[in-house]
Amino acid sequence: ISWKKSMRWADHELYWGRPLKSILCCFDNKTLEFVYHHLVSSNITFIDKDFEKKTRKFVSFKDYLAFFKSKNIILDNKKREQFIEDRLNKIAKKENLKILLNSNLLNEVTNIVEKPNIIKCRFDKRFLEIPDDILVTTMQVHQKYFPTFDTRDNLTNNFFLVADNKDIKGLIKVGNENVVEARLNDAKFFWDKNKTQNLVKGISNLKKLSYFEGLGS
């Protein structure tokens, strides 16, 4: 498997999409042993919990599935995506909101969480003066949030985020609301600044720009 961007673990020479720490390989209730670079497969995997490295042995795939299910971790990608979509729609309906469910964003957040939890947040209504496209781009592209609309299809100041755990103390909600507040303050500043510029002159300035495909990121 080739990756555009790879990482390696410590001083080992193995490059992968993410640093590999261990390989769990079992079949028919038996451990299949093989060597891949510096790693030797086993029936043990590492579980990060409260910043501690803990090990867990598995004798079968059934045992493996049961363990993660008990931790509310959804291993199956399709089931995890469906769970997120269903929860988003259910909460939005309960709040009398319409959710902007972008399929690319849904796929992206599905792949960055293990035990998804939907959290409803909001930003200051004064930012609704900014054009919808700017607000939606800020929420979807930069923050991975799901914007919402009211029954008249007007963008609201409510949005949903998909967290990777329960927000018991409400810190995830507050933290994300603070982050989007800063983002929207920046967006409003540049929007207000752009409104003072002459549009025709701005278009003519595009002639001064040069575009190079594949340069930078």
What do the predicted segments below correspond to?
Residues I1-E129, D133-L135:
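Long, basic N-terminal domains or extensions that often function
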Residues L100-G216:
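Catalytic nucleotidyl-transfer cores of nucleotide-processing enzymes
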